[in-house]
Structure formats: structure tokens, C-alpha cells
Regions:
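Glycine-rich, phosphate-binding/catalytic loops in enzymes
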Residues: 43-46, 111-113, 153
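Stable alpha-helical structural segments in soluble proteins, enriched in small hydrophobic residues
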Residues: 73, 77, 81, 149-158
């Protein structure tokens, strides 16, 4: 059975990697929107138990999703993070977010009033049957290091993203790291 509780077990003044157990992933997610570009974007910061940090971003311009502006990016970021965790074999993910709907639509504390938020809540609840999803609200724009990085990454997603990327797994990032190390060694 899915657990929908914001445990908030990772104190902000602690190094997140020191608070993660094996098999757990911590993800900071955020969304952004630029009216001039007519695009929404998302940013994810993944922190692994061994201290490695990976980022991912993307954007979209679906007309129905544009109506939700940055909220579409917020939802995409949370969904991308859970899919990444599932693809990588994690048993649990904690999603840190600054927009309340990310948690409250899933838990039912807020009613999903449109098709987009209904699909988001339904999808996340389904995934919650496969992986433990925990939510922690962090204050927006309050100098929480990784939340600020997720915000910057979401803005990059709007401006520089090439659509919504295929959801990777940890092995994809590890392969890219190995290739980069080999290239650096060759230079």
C-alpha cells in the first residue's frame, strides 16, 4: 500500500547524502514558465546515498498544459523523478518541492479539478504502489541549496530544453560519467 506522508526526515542543515539509506533517492524538483517562449519546464536534482548528484531538465509546449504555466513543470519534475527512481531500482524516493500541489493532489488534500492534475494524481498514486514516495515541502526562494538549484535547472529547462527527455536510469548517468572520464584521460 502506498504511503503518502511528508516525513521531512532530512534536516536542511545536514548534508543530504548523510541522511540517505541504501536504496533511497532524494530528489528536489521545480517548475518554471516563460510567457515569451510559451513553454513550461522542469528541473530535477537527484542526490544518491553515495553523494553523487545528477541533474535533469526538459520543457514542453502542450496547449492544455500551457494553461497551468509553471505548475505543469512542477508536475513533470515530480513524475520524472519517480520514473527515474523506478527505472534505477530504488525502493524509496523523497521528493522535495516548493509547490504544495505536488503532494496535496496525490494525497487527496487538494481536489484535482482539471484533467491535467487528475492524471498527475492518478499516475503518482499508481507508481506509489511500486515504490515508496515521500514528500517534503521546502520554502520557496529561501536559500535552501538544492531547492535553489532545482529552480535554476527548471529555468534552464524552459530556455534550453529540447522537449521532455526520455527518462533515464542511474546506469545511463554512470555510463555518461565513464565516457567523460575516458575522454578526459585521452586529452
Amino acid at each position: 500500500m502506498a504511503q503518502w506522508q511528508g516525513l521531512g526526515r532530512y534536516p536542511e542543515n545536514a548534508d543530504p547524502k548523510d541522511c540517505l539509506a541504501a536504496g533511497e533517492l532524494l530528489a528536489y524538483v521545480d517548475g518554471s514558465y516563460q510567457d515569451a517562449l510559451k513553454k513550461y519546464g522542469f528541473g530535477c536534482i537527484f542526490i544518491l546515498p553515495d553523494g553523487r548528484i545528477y541533474t535533469e531538465y526538459g520543457n514542453g509546449d502542450n496547449p492544455d498544459s500551457l494553461k497551468q504555466r509553471n505548475v505543469s513543470g512542477e508536475m513533470l519534475g515530480a513524475m520524472y523523478a519517480v520514473r527515474f527512481a523506478l527505472n534505477s531500482g530504488f525502493r524509496a524516493i523523497e521528493i522535495r518541492y516548493d509547490y504544495e500541489g505536488i503532494e496535496k493532489w496525490v494525497t487527496g488534500a487538494w481536489k484535482s479539478k482539471n484533467e491535467l492534475t487528475q492524471k498527475y494524481a492518478q499516475t503518482m498514486r499508481g507508481w506509489g504502489q511500486k515504490i515508496q514516495i515521500r514528500f517534503t515541502k521546502v520554502p520557496a526562494h529561501s536559500k535552501v541549496k538544492y531547492n535553489e538549484l532545482a529552480d535554476e535547472t527548471a529555468k534552464l529547462g524552459v530556455a534550453n530544453g529540447n522537449g521532455i527527455p526520455k527518462v533515464k536510469s542511474l546506469s545511463d548517468f554512470e555510463a555518461a560519467d565513464a565516457a567523460e572520464r575516458m575522454q578526459d584521460a585521452a586529452e
